[in-house]
């Protein structure tokens, strides 16, 4: 029976950083993607410089640069998942996708018996510690990518159509990101709302893509990617993290 030192709930750069510096770690992620905080929600196209201080952080940074994901003050967040997967494969860090922790029980010897659900059914992972790296913030927005022949008109109309929304340039020229605040809706109900509203627009803005996940604000958890603006910074926060209790 294999016993891990740490089981991390939630895949991300902090999780990978922790796993890189703590070899007996396994990561469980409910979704089918690895970069769930930057890539999936298209969290930001503005690059915030960060210089890594660890060998692993430098290697991850090197992979990002090899794909030209950081250019000037912008970042191509669309390529983050590919870069992240390259690093994880290279380091052979254990990650279980579509894996959800459904229960946990502390045995008499102090080992945690975590029951997890995967595509193959229920199974058990035994670990000394669990870290929950998921963000619990209720402050969330949904990112909508669009193009417009008259960008000025679109940037004026969209924040009025979607109350509290903001518009920022995306990585590729001529594309923009609309950040729509989400209140009382889940990922399934908010998309029909977006589509319906979009049909009433008059500026000619063309919807390209709706992010499959919400963009969340950091909730103070140092093991949440959402607490950081740069993926390399998030990675090193996990790499140097030495928390003793479950987060």
Residue spans for each PLM region:
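Conserved N-terminal/central alpha/beta ligand/cofactor-binding core
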Residues: 24, 29-103, 139, 144-146
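Residue-level detector of alpha-helix initiation sites
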Residues: 12-13, 33, 229
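Predominantly flavin-linked oxidoreductase catalytic cores and closely associated redox partners
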Residues: 95-205
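Short glycine-rich, low-complexity/disordered patches
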Residues: 72-76, 202-216
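C-terminal catalytic lobe of FAD-dependent flavoproteins
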Residues: 208-247
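N-terminal Rossmann-like FAD-binding beta1-loop-alpha1 element of flavoenzymes
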Residues: 2-27
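Alpha-helix C-terminal capping segments
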Residues: 16-23, 67, 131-135
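Generic structural signal for well-ordered, non-membrane alpha-helical segments
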Residues: 53, 57, 73-81, 187-194, ...
């Amino acid at each position: 029976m294999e016993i891990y030192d740490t089981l991390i709930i939630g895949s991300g750069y902090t999780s990978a950083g922790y796993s890189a510096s703590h070899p007996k770690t396994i990561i469980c992620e409910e979704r089918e993607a690895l970069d769930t905080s930057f890539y999936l929600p298209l969290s930001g196209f503005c690059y915030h410089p960060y210089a890594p201080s660890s060998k692993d952080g430098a290697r991850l940074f090197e992979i990002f640069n090899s794909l030209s994901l950081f250019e000037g003050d912008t970042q191509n967040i669309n390529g983050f998942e590919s870069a992240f997967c390259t690093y994880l494969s290279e380091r052979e860090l254990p990650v279980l996708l579509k894996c959800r922790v459904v229960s946990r029980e502390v045995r008499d010897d102090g080992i945690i018996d975590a029951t997890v659900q995967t595509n193959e059914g229920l199974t058990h992972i035994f670990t000394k510690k669990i870290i929950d790296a998921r963000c619990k913030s209720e402050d969330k927005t949904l990112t909508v990518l669009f193009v417009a022949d008259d960008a000025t008109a679109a940037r004026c109309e969209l924040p009025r159509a979607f109350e509290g929304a903001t518009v920022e340039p995306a990585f590729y020229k001529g594309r923009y990101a609309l950040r729509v605040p989400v209140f009382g809706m889940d990922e399934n109900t908010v998309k029909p709302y977006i589509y319906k509203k979009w049909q009433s627009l008059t500026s000619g803005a063309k919807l390209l893509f709706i992010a499959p996940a919400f963009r969340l604000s950091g909730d103070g958890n140092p093991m949440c990617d959402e607490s950081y603006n740069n993926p390399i910074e998030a990675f090193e926060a996990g790499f140097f993290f030495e928390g003793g209790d479950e987060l």
